[in-house]
């Protein structure tokens, strides 16, 4: 909250008090202040004066905008503040907007707060006195790190609250009260809009240190099945313990998801990167089998892209994200295999060229390693200069690594970043263009793309522009001669 908004809020509260009312900061802003978290959105609730009187007050402070007439909600032009009158709500249909609203400035603090979801969000702070009104024990629940619903009936009127409970658990590291888990388990999430589901999932993926807790919480509630059925299918799906000592595909996915959160700030698209971590092994649902007494999932990286696309069609509405996922899942196994084999520059160039986000591909490969130590990612935007930049030996997971294994892992990571530098250097050099070919008599045609692709392969192989042009011209003439 900036100083200008703070001044406006205090002026509003003073004018309301002069008229016999009281203005409170409510909801998440009060919770975040108590938790010493940054306050993003400020909501004000004005008690004890009518809507007409409130509008008159707001007109003296600026230009009031009534954007929620049915809810008695206002804002002031140029300010990030929502101002509302107290209200009660009653479910009147299956849609998330199907509520009967009754605005009542004199309803009282406790009844006004009853419509809120959790005790920690039912706090009010008197703007002038600083006094906290806590009708449902929210401050104690914050101290005890508990997410607890307020009213059984009203809580169950909005099924989205099951997802909100999971989202708060992942972001705050709180536990959801058993009674709240129980009531969430009985909610029907099928009529929720995909946009609302994605909104809660996105908060968990982008704002949590442990985004896995969002999905673990939904699992405890028994609420994965409709919106996240692919994730539910990972539970109990066995993996080869030689390569995945951590357990089933669900456990592996949750571990990768939490590791990916460390790389989130450096990823080219943080949200897409986190969705990659979430969906990367969906292909194991259809490919896992026993072969000669061992568990394998051959080709899961290929089939996984299609399954992930169906998942994204259900819960995600970004074409760029779908493009990212459909490219990265088929490629996600390549870095670790290539690093293990110390493959040629030509091969690493092809890998990075195929990837929509080469840096992210390396970050993800690090996350996807079983038995991986905790990572210090502060310096991962460049090839590391020192091994300790990538491994934190104080991590409990790092105890699973021997000294030799740690060294090999450091070397593999450095190998990939070194090769990425080589690839970028190669891509910065002069190369054969379509204009170069046209200038030398190779006119555009149906096969022009094939000819340019040949030139690009030479570029990836490190062939100089001069030599690549000669070879491409020769290839083009032979190709067209054969076609004729």
Segments from the language model and where they lie:
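Catalytic cores of the polymerase beta-like nucleotidyltransferase superfamily
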Residues: 1-484
């Amino acid at each position: 909250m900036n100083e200008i908004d703070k001044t406006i809020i205090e002026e509003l509260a003073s004018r309301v008090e002069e008229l016999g009312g009281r203005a409170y900061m409510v909801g998440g802003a009060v919770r975040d202040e108590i938790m010493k978290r940054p306050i993003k959105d400020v909501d004000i609730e004005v008690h004890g004066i009518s809507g007409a009187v409130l509008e008159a007050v707001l007109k003296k402070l600026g230009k009031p905008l009534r954007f929620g007439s049915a809810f008695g909600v206002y804002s002031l032009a140029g300010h990030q503040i929502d101002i509302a009158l107290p209200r009660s709500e009653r479910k009147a249909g299956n849609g998330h907007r199907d509520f009967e609203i009754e605005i009542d400035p004199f309803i009282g603090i406790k009844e006004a707060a009853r419509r809120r979801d959790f005790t920690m969000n039912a706090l009010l702070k008197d703007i002038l006195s600083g006094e906290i009104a806590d009708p449902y024990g929210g401050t104690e629940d914050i101290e005890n790190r508990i997410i607890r619903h307020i009213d059984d009936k009203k809580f169950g009127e909005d099924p989205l609250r099951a997802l909100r409970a999971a989202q708060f658990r992942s972001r705050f590291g709180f536990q959801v009260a058993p009674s709240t888990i129980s009531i969430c388990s009985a909610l029907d999430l099928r009529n929720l809009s995909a946009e609302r589901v994605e909104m809660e999932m996105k908060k968990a993926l982008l704002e949590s240190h442990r985004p896995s807790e969002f999905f673990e919480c939904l699992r405890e509630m028994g609420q994965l099945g409709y919106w996240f059925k692919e994730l539910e299918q990972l539970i109990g799906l066995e993996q080869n313990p030689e390569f995945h000592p951590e357990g089933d595909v669900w456990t592996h996915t949750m571990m990768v998801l939490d590791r990916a959160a460390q790389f989130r700030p450096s990823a080219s698209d943080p949200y897409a990167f986190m969705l990659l971590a979430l969906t990367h092994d969906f292909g194991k649902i259809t490919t896992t089998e026993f072969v000669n007494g061992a568990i394998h999932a051959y080709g899961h990286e290929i089939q996984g892209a299609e399954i992930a696309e169906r998942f994204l069609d259900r819960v995600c509405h970004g074409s760029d994200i779908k493009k990212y996922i459909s490219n990265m899942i088929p490629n996600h196994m390549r870095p670790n295999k290539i690093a293990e084999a110390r493959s040629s520059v030509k091969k690493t160039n092809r890998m990075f060229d195929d990837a929509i986000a080469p840096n992210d591909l390396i970050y993800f490969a690090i996350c996807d390693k079983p038995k991986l130590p905790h990572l210090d990612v502060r310096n991962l935007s460049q090839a590391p200069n020192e091994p300790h930049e990538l491994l934190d030996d104080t991590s409990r997971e790092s105890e699973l690594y021997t000294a030799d294994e740690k060294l090999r892992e450091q070397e593999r990571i450095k190998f990939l970043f070194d090769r990425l530098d080589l690839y970028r250097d190669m891509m910065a050099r002069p190369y054969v263009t379509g204009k170069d070919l046209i200038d030398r008599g190779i006119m555009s045609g149906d096969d022009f793309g094939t000819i340019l692709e040949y030139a690009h392969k030479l570029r990836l192989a490190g062939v100089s522009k001069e030599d690549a042009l000669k070879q491409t011209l020769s290839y083009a003439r032979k190709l067209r001669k054969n076609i004729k």
